[in-house]
């Protein structure tokens, strides 16, 4: 699969939530697009990933 343009192996049955935690992201502070579709946060724990998926993860940061 690709995450933000970088190739990455994905374990069988991996979810969006598991991947975000593995990458060190706070699921409450990111937006995730899978194959061109925004995934609602409420679905992160159920949304399964495959080797063919393309993910874009956008992190929100505070500041002024």
Predicted regions mapped to residue ranges:
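Ubiquitin-like/PB1-type beta-grasp interaction modules and other compact soluble beta-rich domains
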Residues: 1-63
